[in-house]
Amino acid sequence: MNDINPAFVMPDVQSSPDTRQIPIQRVGVKGVRYPVTLKTPAGIMPSVGTFNLDVHLPADQKGTHMSRFVALLEEERAPLELSSFRLMLDKMLEKLEAEAGRIEVTFPYFISKTAPVSGVESLLDYEVTLTGEVRDGAARVFLKALVPVTSLCPCSKKISQYGAHNQRSHITMNVELAGELPVEALVRMAEEEASCELWGLLKRPDEKFVTERAYENPKFVEDLVRDIAMRLNADDRIVAYVLEAENFESIHNHSAYAVIERDKRVD
């Protein structure tokens, strides 16, 4: 028999008091994969998000209600954009009866690109992360993008009679936002400052262009972060950032790496 006596009330263990009086800064669920739709300049894009959701737990409360995090994802099926993401964060705090919390979602984001010479179109994928958090009554939203590019070594070009070593590089930008910033705009900041950008599909004339473009635009890893930092510094939609560049060196079994961090509110 599965009949439940309506007079029987199941105990809410999570809401019971805790005598240890130790607050928990972040408690929740991690690595929840859920379908999402993304609102992009090209229209609605289906994707799959990996969510981390957590809240602050007061010292006098035994536990949080873990099921409510997944219930939130089930309820929030509107296309994901910055405005709806902020609303999701507010709803999580209300549902979990919490004063502070955090949502992080990572998903593949596809941009249609046109090859530089042949004009053929193809998609290129980027790893994008949205993070929203409320602490001490203040809300903050972060946009992170990992952008693959090509880098070509200036030293190798200078000392060689012909050719220069080049490699794929990853530019990672994690920016705190003061206004709406499309993913495409952030991606272009990195691609336009690289030795050359990448495409999913290239024909032979395009490959010639890419090779020559990189050769004419050599950059050290230091050049990459400095040039991109100038773009981030000039954009009023960005109030703080962590900018990383990693070159997967083709002549070494290690990477070259550089980081620039800045908070415009304190300098």
Swiss-Prot record:
GO MF term (any one): GTP cyclohydrolase I activity
Annotated site location: May be catalytically important: 153
Protein's UniProt name: GTP cyclohydrolase FolE2
Pathway assignment: Cofactor biosynthesis; 7,8-dihydroneopterin triphosphate biosynthesis; 7,8-dihydroneopterin triphosphate from GTP: step 1/1
Family from the record: Belongs to the GTP cyclohydrolase IV family.
Class of enzymatic activity (EC top level): hydrolase
Chain's role: Converts GTP to 7,8-dihydroneopterin triphosphate.
EC number, UniProt record: 3.5.4.16
Keywords: Hydrolase
